[in-house]
Structure formats: structure tokens, C-alpha cells
Amino acid sequence: MLSALLLGSLLAAGPSENPTLETRLAPLAKDHKGKIALAVKNLETGESYYRNADEVMPTASLIKVAVLIELYQQAQEDKLKLTDRVRLRAADKVPGSGILTEHFSDGADFSLRDAARLMIAFSDNTATNLVLDRVGVKSVNRRMEAWGFPNTRINAKVYLGSTTSVAPERTRRYGLGSTTAREMVELLEQLQMSERCRPFCKQAILNHLAKNADKDKFKRFLPADVVVMHKDGSTRDTRTDAGLIHTPAGIVAVCVLTTDNKDRRWHSDNAGNLLCARVAKEVYDHFASTKEPKTR
């Protein structure tokens, strides 16, 4: 009788009370109408989940993380100063996301640090190109390769692929940049663990990522007080997001890459946006449900 009661209680509890990352995330990936790659890693415990994580995918503006890192590494190496001034010219203005093109006058003068703020907080394309003019597209790629990320590459200045591409075939295939979900999570891990950056450099980069204004993707379904340090990207058929999410069980690096998406609407409820948001929510809920997750 006692054994029957115990068996009944176990069955009632069910296996879904504390679902695994795979149980939470695999259905989201399966239901998405488009190509998807995922990588998740708890940086304190090592618990992880990967799906198509080594497939090279377009980044859209997510590649601006690599540009930001190169800027701060060159500052760390005394190749430039973050207080160096840049002057906005009419010829510098490109379309797309951001505020410089529409709201700043020709001749506006500001620091490289402020250009970086605009590049990350508002994904400003013009600001990104101003930073790239100083650090160099090829320098970003050399840095990523030296750090062990050969597939994390920027191919050209934003909206200037026809005249500034350093890899025309990659530009045609991937657009602005490319990466893999695994490489992006490992890059975020190296950044968080200060394996490559001095503390001031690391903290400055993370502060930029924490001020990303996008609320359509990772931050969308998370509690307002959750710290999310991330960069997202969007093109007509691509949605991406990658960052560090603070959970009760530690900091978790997450990357979601999607492309060839059926939903190509420029709308906050785009299916790619919602997928990024749901992945972040499932990851947070998983690690909020236990402070001692499994390591594998």
C-alpha cells in the first residue's frame, strides 16, 4: 500500500516539474519557420544546450559586438583613445537603425566612446561605420581569429558592402557579418571571465551591452529587474540576439541565430523576435527554478 502511494506521488509530480533545457528549448526551435542555431551555457556550472551551434549564420547587427571589442582592445593597447573625436559628415550617413542620420546635423562632433554608445544602445549604423573607420574592418576579423573565432567576421561597413567589402563572397552569402552560436557564446564567456580584457575594458563593454535599448527580443518577457547584457540584429529575413543573462543560478551566455525566416515583417511581433524572447524566458525560468542545476 505504501509503495503504491509513493509511486502515485511520483507519477503525479511528473517529469515536467523541472524540465531540462532541451525539453524547454527544442520545441521552440522545431516550431520556428526558418533556420535556427542556439547555444546556451551557464558560466558558473557549465550546464549547456546546443542546437546547430556550429553552423555559420548571418549576424545582422549582432556583429557590432566584435566591433565594440576591437575598439576597446585598441584603446587598451594605446592605439587610440576613447576620447578621440569624430566628426559627422553628410557622406557618412547611411540608412537603417540609429539616430545620427536623421537627428544629427552635418559637422556634429563627438567622442569615439559616444559613437560606441550609439552603435550598441541604438544599433546606429552610421556610428558603427565611424568606429570602423578608426579600427578597421580587417582588424576586427584578425582579432576574432586570434581569439579563436574564425567564423565571427564582419564583411564590410554597414550599407556599403559594394564598395567596402573585404570578402565579397561572404558579403553576398551572409550580409554584414557571420558567426556561429557556439563561437558567440564562447566570445561572451571570454569577455565575462576577463580572459582577454583588462577589468576596465571588460566593464566598459558590458556596460554598453547592458544599455541596449531593444525590448523586442531577449528582454521582452523577462522581469524588469533582470540584468541582460546583449546585442541583437535584424534584417528582412534574419533575427539574432546574444548576450549574458543574470539568473539566480549564475550568469548565462545565450545566443539565438535565425535566418531564412518565413516571417519577414518589420514588426515587434515578428516570429524571429518572439523566438528570441521565448528562448530567453525559458532559459531564465530554467535557472530560476533551481540554484544548483546539473553540469555536463
Predicted ranges, named:
Residues Q73-R117:
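Active-site-proximal loop and beta-strand segments within enzyme catalytic domains
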Residues G46, P58-V86, M119, V254:
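Active-site SXXK
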Residues E17-L25, R134, V185-D216, M229-R296:
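Structured C-terminal helix/loop/strand segments within mature extracytoplasmic catalytic/sensor domains
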Residues R51-P58, I99-D106, D114-L118, T126-L132, ...:
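Second-shell loop/turn segments in exported
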